[in-house]
Amino acid sequence: MSESSSIKRTLIGRVVSDKMDKTVTVLVERKVKHPMYGKVMVRSKKYHAHNEGNSAKAGDLVEIVETRPVSRTKTWAVTSVLEKAIVV
């Protein structure tokens, strides 16, 4: 394969659930401009990401990268925890 196909998509989002083993649910928010009115809106999507060492917990800010399918719903993997959640 060529080197251009090895570029992986990465996203940054907040972990909203870590109740599954080796899996976290990551909420990724993006800003889009309304095509007619021009207002900037926030759109969000949830991704299931593979978390091998169960290192990411709920509330953490994580970076996820696209990988080969691990299961029916998991095609993303956690690469790093950027910010830990504040425990109260």
From Swiss-Prot:
Part of the 30S ribosomal subunit. One of its GO terms (molecular function) is rRNA binding. InterPro entries: NA-bd_OB-fold, Ribosomal_uS17, Ribosomal_uS17_bact/chlr, Ribosomal_uS17_CS. The keyword rRNA-binding applies. This is Small ribosomal subunit protein uS17. The gene is rpsQ. Belongs to the universal ribosomal protein uS17 family. It comes from Dechloromonas aromatica (strain RCB). GO terms for cellular component: cytosolic small ribosomal subunit. GO terms for biological process: translation. One of the primary rRNA binding proteins, it binds specifically to the 5'-end of 16S ribosomal RNA. HAMAP family: Ribosomal_uS17_B. It holds the Pfam family Ribosomal_S17. CDD domains: Ribosomal_uS17 (cd00364). Keywords: Ribonucleoprotein, Ribosomal protein, RNA-binding, rRNA-binding.
